[in-house]
């Protein structure tokens, strides 16, 4: 299953140690009662609580943000068939969003250009760092051509930082999707997470690590989304079915929504934006979820040939379908009806994401919008293929890509209007 790199990927480019916070907000502060507890271990809780269901259309109300803005609340607690109480994935992920937003609230609104920390270089290190970023640039140019061109529209510091994050995400994805994936064990992912801790502590292992280590020392990037992406890789090793959308949502957050949380501090929020920092992070998260859902819908046949089904099992059953129908690869009326609903949901996530793009800094809007428009068009191509995602791979043609770029540019010029 390929990972959607949000903010950064065009259709042709896509190829237990995570933390969950039980957080309490007070003004601009956030109190984290979790430390580094495992998100999976916190799925079962014994208390009640509100759920921030910011899901795509309207914010549902009762919760209060630091800005005084109210959101409606649905219950975050879900009963399992065994009668246990669990916390929904969206609530858990939203707690992570709150932490990221609190972390960068002051830094991102000071000036149009991010206030990057200027370190005093150790003699001899500048050349090595320059070489490290150059190598990240080469990796991006080779494996993510459209993304690479988009980054050239950014300021030099942002561009280098996004390259470093992209390369780390790609290396992480290749642990379970690359040529050596069959040899990867949970212990190997544990070692990769230990190495991540070293990167954030200023102890890089190699040149590519050094670029990321430099990036996180300059920008207000938190380690948690990186840990969560590694947890998504663990999930891919042990899980090939998802009982419902709540489980699938958590997987999509791990492998793609995390990239949005990593990227917002680099992209920057427009100083004139009246939107809350939380809402911009929500939009980034929504784009990651939308991209990964699109990957899943595009790659149904490819994943089935690997024995994997990344579709909600309960929704398949409600549509009168099963894994056997997917492995058979027949496009039936039942399949078309099922796919229409899945595509509709993915589009709602794209719509929510698009609302937040105008809140980004001016230099970041165009590449982000281009990525969004191109990825959303994959859904159109699935429809054009009569929902045959078993033997036909939906893709956006070069002429359609060229048409999308000026549209994205025009949209990027629209100033922020949200309050």
From Swiss-Prot:
It catalyses: 2 (2E,6E,10E)-geranylgeranyl diphosphate = 15-cis-phytoene + 2 diphosphate. Its EC number is 2.5.1.32. SUPFAM superfamilies: Terpenoid synthases (SSF48576). Pathway: Carotenoid biosynthesis; phytoene biosynthesis; all-trans-phytoene from geranylgeranyl diphosphate: step 1/1. Keywords: Carotenoid biosynthesis, Chromoplast, Isoprene biosynthesis, Plastid, Transferase, Transit peptide. Coiled coil: none annotated. It comes from the Eukaryota. It is found in: Plastid, Chromoplast stroma. Optimum pH is 7.6. Signal peptide: none annotated. InterPro entries: Isoprenoid_synthase_dom_sf, Squ/phyt_synthse, Squalene/phytoene_synthase_CS, Trans_IPPS_bact-type, Trans_IPPS_HH. Catalyzes the two steps reaction converting geranylgeranyl diphosphate to phytoene via prephytoene diphosphate. Belongs to the phytoene/squalene synthase family. While the color of orange fruits is due either to the accumulation of beta-carotene, or due to only the accumulation of red and yellow carotenoids, all peppers studied have a wild type PSY1 enzyme. This is Bifunctional 15-cis-phytoene synthase, chromoplastic. It comes from Capsicum annuum (Capsicum pepper).
């Amino acid at each position: 299953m390929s990972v959607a790199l949000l903010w950064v990927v065009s259709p042709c480019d896509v190829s237990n140690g995570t933390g969950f916070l039980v957080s309490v907000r007070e003004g601009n502060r956030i109190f984290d009662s979790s430390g580094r507890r495992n998100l999976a271990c916190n799925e079962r809780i014994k208390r009640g609580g509100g759920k921030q269901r910011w899901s795509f259309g309207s914010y549902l109300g009762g919760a209060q943000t630091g800005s005084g803005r109210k959101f409606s609340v649905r219950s975050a607690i879900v009963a399992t068939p065994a009668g246990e109480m669990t916390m929904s994935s969206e609530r858990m992920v939203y707690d992570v969003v709150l932490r990221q937003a609190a972390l960068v609230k002051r830094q991102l609104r000071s000036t149009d250009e991010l206030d990057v920390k200027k370190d005093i270089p150790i003699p001899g290190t500048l050349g090595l760092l320059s070489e490290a970023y150059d190598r990240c640039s080469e990796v991006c140019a080779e494996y993510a051509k459209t993304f690479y061109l988009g980054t050239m529209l950014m300021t030099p510091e942002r561009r280098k930082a996004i390259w470093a994050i992209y390369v780390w995400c790609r290396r992480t994805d290749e642990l379970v999707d690359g040529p050596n994936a069959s040899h990867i064990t949970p212990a190997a992912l544990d070692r990769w997470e230990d190495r991540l801790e070293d990167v954030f502590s200023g102890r890089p292992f190699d040149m590519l690590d050094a670029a990321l280590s430099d990036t996180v020392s300059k920008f207000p990037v938190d380690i948690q989304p990186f840990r969560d992406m590694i947890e998504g890789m663990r999930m891919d090793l042990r899980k090939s079915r998802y009982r419902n959308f709540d489980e699938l949502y958590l997987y999509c957050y791990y492998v793609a929504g995390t990239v949005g949380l990593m990227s917002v501090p680099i992209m920057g929020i427009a100083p004139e934006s009246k939107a809350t920092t939380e809402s911009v992070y929500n939009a980034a998260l929504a784009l990651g979820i939308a991209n990964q859902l699109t990957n899943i819908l595009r790659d149904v046949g490819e994943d089935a040939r690997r024995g994997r089904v990344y579709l909600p099992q309960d929704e398949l059953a409600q549509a009168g379908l099963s894994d056997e129908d997917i492995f058979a690869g027949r496009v039936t009326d039942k399949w078309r009806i099922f796919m229409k609903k899945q595509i509709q949901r993915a589009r709602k996530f794209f719509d929510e994401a698009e609302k937040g793009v105008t809140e980004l800094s001016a230099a970041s809007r165009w590449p982000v919008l281009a990525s969004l428009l191109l990825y959303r068009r994959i859904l159109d191509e699935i429809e054009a293929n009569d929902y045959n995602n078993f033997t036909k791979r939906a893709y956006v043609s070069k002429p359609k890509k060229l048409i999308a770029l000026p549209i994205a540019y025009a949209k990027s010029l629209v100033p922020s209007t949200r309050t």
